[in-house]
Curated annotation (Swiss-Prot):
Keywords: Coiled coil, Cytoplasm, Phosphoprotein. It comes from the Eukaryota. This is Coiled-coil domain-containing protein 125. Residues 1-110 are annotated as: Disordered. The modification Phosphoserine is found at residue 504.
Length: 511
């Protein structure tokens, strides 16, 4: 079976080669004058020569068991490409030739077939070697193409990376320049700050030294001031003791002398300086003359008199105000007395009517007047009054009218006492205001006398005069240090019956 297959394959190869030879020699499909069914000789030498030249276009043999698939696919593709090149007319002529040559090939001998088989095997081996070489070349070319592609891709990537690298290098250079500039600025600022810090440290040390020196000087000065204050306090105490030992006139003279000695012409007022400067006749040494001094002293006296006149006007106004206050108080008191008198008359009428009605009622019930077992209205009022001799004079003062009159007198006395208290408080307030203004003026003129606001406590005792009214004969008002207003009823209208005890303000009321 293998021999038959080999012979059939060899015959197919021979037929294919004859067809190719016909194509090369110029046969256009007419069979070169041959008829179908005829027997013709085949030249194997010429065919073998063409095979050796490498121009065999025979179709590929059947694949053996040991052949590779890539070789078969390569041969098949080559054969298919060659077959596609022939025209359709040549294919029909080839089929006719094959049918005519089958009979002629069957008559060949076995030896010739073996020789042909050996030759074909050799050619197949040569073709295998050539195929392997061409495959190696193809593989090498593919690898070279891959390498070239990778190199092209790498070239593109490297160009991009080179551009990016150049940009990064430029950025790095610019950043390095900026960093160098910033470092230089930092070093410059650091040096400048060091210099400033050193200068401030020197200033701080110098100020600390000066502060220490000033503290020491301040301590010394404070000690000196304390010593001077203590000496001044002692001298002021001695001065006050000496003034207390003198009379009022001597005290005034001493105060005037002290003011003149302290002030002199160095502490003269603006008016005195103006008068002294207006003088044209200058004495020896540029001092003002006696006439200028006299004019300055007269100006000063004139100002003092003006101040005293203002004080007198104020006191006059106060006197008018006090007189008006007394007048208003007495008018109010008279109005109250009139109202109380009207009320008393009405009460008397009502009391008389009530007594008559009660007596008539008792007479109607019992036929005789009832004894007075209870206290009367006047006795009850007297019992409410806390007096020592009220129990002794209970029988004499049994009528309620007398008791009411006594109560009215007491109320009037209280009202008068309150009015006097108001006046005295007003007077004391004005006196204190005057003293405050005088002390402020003295402080402005003589600032050394700050510790002595009351140098002359007996100066304004004459301002408080004895006050009198038609009812009260003695009203005593003391000085501003302690004032007690006492009111005694030594002279009272004889028409009114009063108690024997004295009605006065309590001793606890002190202004």
């Amino acid at each position: 079976m293998s021999k038959v297959a080999r012979s059939s394959s060899e015959s197919d190869v021979q037929l294919w080669e004859t067809e190719e030879d016909d194509m090369t020699e110029g046969d256009l499909g007419y069979g070169l004058g041959r008829k179908p069914g005829g027997i013709y000789e085949i030249e194997f030498s010429h065919r073998s020569r063409k095979r050796s030249d490498g121009k065999n276009f025979s179709p590929p043999p059947f694949p053996r068991k040991g052949e590779e698939r890539n070789e078969a696919s390569f041969q098949y593709s080559k054969h298919k490409s060659q077959q596609d090149t022939f025209p359709q007319v040549s294919r029909i002529s080839n089929y006719r030739r094959q049918s005519s040559t089958v009979d002629s090939n069957s008559e060949l001998s076995n030896e010739e077939l073996r020789q042909c088989l050996n030759e074909t095997l050799e050619e197949v081996e040569m073709l295998k070697t050539e195929l392997e070489a061409s495959q190696r070349q193809l593989r090498g070319k593919e690898e070279a193409l891959k390498i070239l592609q990778s190199m092209a891709i790498l070239g593109k990537a490297t160009s991009h990376t080179q551009a990016v690298l150049q940009k990064t290098m430029e950025q790095n250079r610019s950043l390095e320049k900026e960093i160098n500039a910033l470092q230089w600025e930092i070093e410059f600022d650091h040096n400048r700050f060091k210099n400033i810090e050193e200068s401030w440290i020197q200033k701080y040390d110098r100020l600390n030294c000066e502060n220490a020196v000033l503290k020491e000087n301040l301590k010394v000065k404070t000690e000196e001031i304390k010593m001077l204050k203590s000496d001044n306090a002692v001298l002021n105490q001695r001065y006050l003791e000496a003034l207390a030992m003198l009379d009022i006139k001597q005290q005034k003279m001493a105060q005037e002398n002290m003011c003149c000695d302290k002030s002199g012409f160095a502490e003269a007022s603006g008016l005195e300086l103006a008068v002294l400067g207006a003088c044209l006749c200058h004495g020896p040494g540029g001092n003002p003359c006696s006439c200028a001094r006299m004019a300055a002293s007269t100006r000063k006296l004139l100002l003092q008199l003006k101040q005293e006149l203002e004080i007198l006007q104020k006191s006059k106004e106060e006197a008018y105000v006090m007189a008006d206050a007394f007048r208003i108080a007495f008018e109010q008191q008279l109005m109250r007395k009139n109202d109380q008198a009207l009320q008393l008359t009405q009460m008397d009428k009502m009391h008389k009517k009530a007594t008559k009605w009660m007596n008539w009622k008792h007479l109607k019930e019992d036929g005789f007047p009832s004894p007075r077992s209870k206290k009367t209205f006047g006795q009850r009022l007297l019992g409410m009054l806390p007096s020592e001799n009220s129990s002794k004079r209970m029988e004499d003062q049994d009528s309620p009218q007398e008791v009411l009159k006594m109560l009215i007198d007491l109320l009037n006395d209280k009202e008068e006492a309150l009015a006097h208290q108001r006046k005295v408080s007003y007077m004391l307030a004005r006196a204190l205001e005057d003293k405050d203004t005088a002390s402020n003026e003295n402080k402005e003129k003589n600032p050394i006398k700050e510790n002595f606001p009351f140098n002359n406590p007996w100066r304004k005792t004459s301002e408080f005069s004895v006050l009198g009214d038609p009812i009260h004969s003695s009203v005593c008002i003391l000085n501003s240090v302690g004032c007690i207003c006492s009111i005694q009823h030594s002279q009272i209208d004889p028409n009114y019956r009063t108690l024997k005890r004295s009605h006065s303000l309590p001793s606890s009321i002190i202004f």
